[in-house]
Structures are given as structure tokens and as C-alpha cells.
């Protein structure tokens, strides 16, 4: 005999077993219902026939594009690679059923290869298959509405204009349409006016500014029929941060280093060395970034124009530096400074640039007279009898007025008397006088040579200062002008 506790446990176990059996029976019934429905729908189904009751009726296909990733933009080959979901919605009257007859089944997932599908292809495909593979399943509803959303990776052709690289915008389009059915057989309708970007992964180099879709009815030269297509235009903008940091800013620094060449004095001897160093650094930099710049012969990219501008800039600085050094080391023996050069470079430009000769500043600070007054041609000394007697009188006068002792005065009068008596016949005195005149002439010539050399050096300083400002202006305005082009170009397009 079972007690009441054992009877309760047995009753509970029987209930659980019965519930599990009923659930299993119901599940097997559901699977059987789905299998029966599948066999009933596709027993006599022909996937090659359009799903229309009347041959003259078109199949209305609703089409929508969803983008998940902008994988790559190849500027050289002009290809845009995208990861897309293509949503097709149409109605097939042959695939209807009553849910009440099949245990309430309202949806059925069927292989896409088992049903009729619109042959929607990408017209401007560049690489790979033009048509989407039918490996995914389609969602079939009891009223005959079919939703098929296959994923696809397309490499579409996209004519690109890289004139303003790396500040460029591109307009790439994806053109979808039926390849064999015309408008009378398939009518494409676009779902919404924008590309679905809810599941889009941001790209590190490109930003999608706008993605709009448009429907077109086109008559091609090959055929009499009108074909419908849906074209999505992707307006994308390049993110220039990478190129700005690694390309443009180093070029700017190199350009401004070139300007500093004209601030170096010519005497230091490092002007040409600095120019060559800057040119070599720019050349090495160009070799490094060659693979980064799009290689095309259709247009010159903006960054290519800037690199060319920088190269010309550095080359001109070397030419100007050589010219300045040539001026700096000129002498009266090799060159004569024309008057117009003196007027322009020694008077006009210094006043405009507020430059003054260092010698002039020294004279103002120390109150020194013009050195030219000290280098005037001395009067030729002529030792005539009249001059000699005058000189001797002055010497006797000095001797009389002095406080020298009489013994010493008597001894000092003897050389003077000897000079007076033997001046006419002394050849040594004449040699001394000629030597003094020779020294005076050499000093005068040396001073004049120094003045001319100082003028050439000062002219070199003026030319350096002129080109310093010229190169600063050209560098600033050239850089601003080049990089304002994308802004002005986009404003004009808008």
C-alpha cells in the first residue's frame, strides 16, 4: 500500500511526463505543418516564371539600400569598395496560404534559390560579380510578400577628382537595376530617399556627407524598351588629419627654414650649407611620402602642387644665396658699382626697409667725423729754400721759447743747424719724404678700397633683407592661397 505522500509524488511525475509528451507532440505537429506547407507551396512552383497573374502586369519590386561599411576608396584605380545590404520586397501570388490551416504559421524562411527573384545588378561594378549571390534565405509571409535582404561587397567604379587632395570631396554612385526585365515587366520603387545608415561603421579616412537615392527611366541605344534603375549618390569627404600631420606641416616647416637662410650673415659661410640641407631633407621627405600621394597623371593634386612649390622655393633660395655671396665678396679690382645700383640699393631700399649702415650708427654713437675727411689727399710736400728757411725759423723760435738748459740748448741747436746747412745736399731726407708720400698714398688707396668693399657688403645685406621679406610674403600668401582653393572650390560648387 502506498501512503498519501508516495501517491502525491507519483501523481506529480505523471503530470510532468504528460506535459512533456504533449509539448513534444505539438512540436512535431508544428514541424510537420511547416513541412507540409513547404511541400504544398513548392510542389509545382516554377522559379523561372514571373509571379504575375496577367502577363502584361509588371512585378512591383521595392528596393532599399543599407550600408554597413565603407571599406576602401582607391583613388588610383578609381574604385569604391562598400559593404551593403540590399533589401528587395515583392509579392508572389503563388506563395500564399491560410495560417489557420497550418497551426498558425505566418512566416516561412525559404532558400532564395528556390523562388523567383528580380535580377537586380550593379551596373557600374568594377571588380567581381555584378549580381548578388542567392545563398541567403528569403522571408516569406502568408500573404505572398517576400523580403530578401542579401549582404554584398561591391567594388564600384567611381570617377574621382583629386585636385584638392587631401581636402577633396568625391561623388560616387551605385546604379542598381534589372538587367533583362524592362519597365513593363519589373517596376522598381525606391524605399525612402536616403541610404539606410543605422548599422554603418565609421571609416577612419572618409566621411559620408550625404547618400541619396533617385529613380530613373532610361531608354538605351541597344533596345527599344525603357529600363528602370535606382541610383544612389554617395557624397563623401576625406578626413585630412593624417595628411595634415604627416605631410603638410613638415612641408610648412621646411619652407620656413628656407626663409631663415636670408637672415644669416654672409660672413658665416653657412648660407649655402643650410640651403642644401633643406633641399636634401625635402628630397628625402618626398621619397618617403611618394606612396601616400595618389599617383595619377590626370590632374596635379593640391599637395603635389604644394610640394612642387616648396621645391621651387628652396631652389630659388639657393640661387639667390649664391647671388648674394657673389655681391658680398666683390672688390674694386673686379667690379665697379654703377650709380643706379648705388641709388637703388644704397639709398632707396635701405630707407624703405629702415636699414642703416653699421658705420653710420657708430659715428652717431661716438661722434666720429666722416672717415673720408681723414683720407683726403695730402698736399704734396715741396722742400724749397723758402719753405726750409720758414721751417728753420719756427724751429729757432721753439728753441728760444723753451726752458731747456743752456748746455742742452746748445747741443740741440746743432742738428737744426746741420739740417739747414745740408738740406739741399742730403739725399736721405728726400728718400724719407718720398717714403712718407708713398705711405700716405697707400693708406688713401687702402681706405678707398675698404669703402668700396663696405658698399658691396652693405648692398649684399640689403639684397638679403629684400629677399627675406619677399620670401616671407611668397611663403605665407602662397601657402594660404593654395590651401584656400578647396574652400573656394567647394563654395563655388555649392
UniProtKB/Swiss-Prot annotation:
Extracellular side: 31-240
Membrane-topology descriptor: Multi-pass membrane protein
Listed GO CC annotations: acetylcholine-gated channel complex; cation channel complex; dopaminergic synapse; neurotransmitter receptor complex; postsynaptic membrane; presynaptic membrane
Residue spans, topological domain Cytoplasmic: 328-465
The organism's place on the tree of life at top rank: Eukaryota
UniProtKB keywords: Cell membrane, Disulfide bond, Glycoprotein, Ion channel, Ion transport, Ligand-gated ion channel, Membrane, Phosphoprotein, Receptor, Signal, Synapse, Transmembrane, Transmembrane helix, Transport
Keyword Disulfide bond in record: yes
Description of activity control: Activated by a myriad of ligands such as acetylcholine, cytisine and nicotine. CHRNA6 nAChR activity is inhibited by the antagonists alpha-conotoxin MII and PIA, a small disulfide-constrained peptides from cone snails.
SUPFAM superfamilies assigned to the protein according to its UniProt record, in alphabetical order: Neurotransmitter-gated ion-channel transmembrane pore, Nicotinic receptor ligand binding domain-like
Entry's transmembrane regions: 241-265, 272-290, 306-327, 466-485
Free-text function comment from the UniProt entry: Component of neuronal acetylcholine receptors (nAChRs) that function as pentameric, ligand-gated cation channels with high calcium permeability among other activities. nAChRs are excitatory neurotrasnmitter receptors formed by a collection of nAChR subunits known to mediate synaptic transmission in the nervous system and the neuromuscular junction. Each nAchR subunit confers differential attributes to channel properties, including activation, deactivation and desensitization kinetics, pH sensitivity, cation permeability, and binding to allosteric modulators.
Record protein name field: Neuronal acetylcholine receptor subunit alpha-6
UniProt organism field: Mus musculus (Mouse)
Amino acid at each position: 500500500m502506498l501512503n498519501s505522500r508516495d501517491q502525491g509524488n507519483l501523481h506529480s511525475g505523471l503530470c510532468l511526463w504528460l506535459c512533456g509528451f504533449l509539448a513534444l507532440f505539438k512540436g512535431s505537429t508544428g514541424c510537420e505543418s511547416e513541412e507540409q506547407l513547404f511541400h504544398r507551396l513548392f510542389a509545382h512552383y516554377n522559379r523561372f516564371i514571373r509571379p504575375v497573374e496577367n502577363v502584361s502586369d509588371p512585378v512591383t519590386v521595392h528596393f532599399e539600400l543599407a550600408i554597413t561599411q565603407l571599406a576602401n576608396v582607391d583613388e588610383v584605380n578609381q574604385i569604391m569598395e562598400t559593404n551593403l545590404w540590399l533589401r528587395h520586397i515583392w509579392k508572389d501570388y503563388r506563395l500564399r496560404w491560410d495560417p489557420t490551416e497550418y497551426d498558425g504559421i505566418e512566416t516561412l524562411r525559404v532558400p532564395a534559390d528556390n523562388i523567383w527573384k528580380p535580377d537586380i545588378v550593379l551596373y557600374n561594378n568594377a571588380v567581381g560579380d555584378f549580381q548578388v549571390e542567392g545563398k541567403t534565405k528569403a522571408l516569406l509571409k502568408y500573404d505572398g510578400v517576400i523580403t530578401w535582404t542579401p549582404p554584398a561587397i561591391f567594388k564600384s567604379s567611381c570617377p574621382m577628382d583629386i585636385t584638392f587632395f587631401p581636402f577633396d570631396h568625391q561623388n560616387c554612385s551605385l546604379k542598381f537595376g534589372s538587367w533583362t526585365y524592362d519597365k513593363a515587366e519589373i517596376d522598381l520603387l525606391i524605399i525612402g530617399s536616403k541610404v539606410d545608415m543605422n548599422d554603418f561603421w565609421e571609416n577612419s579616412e572618409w566621411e559620408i556627407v550625404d547618400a541619396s537615392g533617385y529613380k530613373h527611366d532610361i531608354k538605351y541605344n541597344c533596345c527599344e524598351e525603357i529600363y528602370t534603375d535606382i541610383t544612389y549618390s554617395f557624397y563623401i569627404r576625406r578626413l585630412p588629419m593624417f595628411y595634415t600631420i604627416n605631410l603638410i606641416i613638415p612641408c610648412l616647416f621646411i619652407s620656413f627654414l628656407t626663409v631663415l637662410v636670408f637672415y644669416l650673415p654672409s660672413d658665416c659661410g653657412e648660407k649655402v650649407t643650410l640651403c642644401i640641407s633643406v633641399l636634401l631633407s625635402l628630397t628625402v621627405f618626398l621619397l618617403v611620402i611618394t606612396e601616400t600621394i595618389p599617383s595619377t597623371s590626370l590632374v596635379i593634386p593640391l599637395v603635389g602642387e604644394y610640394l612642387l612649390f616648396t621645391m621651387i622655393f628652396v631652389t630659388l633660395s639657393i640661387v639667390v644665396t649664391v647671388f648674394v655671396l657673389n655681391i658680398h665678396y666683390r672688390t674694386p679690382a673686379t667690379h665697379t658699382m654703377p650709380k643706379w645700383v648705388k641709388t637703388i640699393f644704397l639709398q632707396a631700399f635701405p630707407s624703405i626697409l629702415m636699414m642703416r649702415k653699421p658705420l653710420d650708427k657708430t659715428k652717431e654713437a661716438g661722434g666720429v667725423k666722416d672717415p673720408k675727411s681723414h683720407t683726403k689727399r695730402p698736399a704734396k710736400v715741396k722742400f724749397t729754400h723758402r719753405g726750409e728757411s720758414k721751417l728753420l725759423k719756427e724751429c729757432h723760435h721753439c728753441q728760444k721759447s723753451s726752458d731747456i738748459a743752456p748746455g742742452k740748448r746748445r747741443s740741440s741747436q746743432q742738428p737744426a743747424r746741420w739740417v739747414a746747412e745740408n738740406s739741399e745736399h742730403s739725399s736721405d731726407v728726400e728718400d724719407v719724404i718720398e717714403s712718407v708720400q708713398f705711405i700716405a698714398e697707400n693708406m688713401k688707396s687702402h681706405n678707398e678700397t675698404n669703402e668700396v668693399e663696405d658698399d658691396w657688403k652693405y648692398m649684399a645685406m640689403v639684397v638679403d633683407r629684400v629677399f627675406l621679406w619677399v620670401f616671407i610674403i611668397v611663403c605665407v600668401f602662397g601657402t594660404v592661397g593654395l590651401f584656400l582653393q578647396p574652400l573656394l572650390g567647394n563654395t563655388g560648387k555649392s
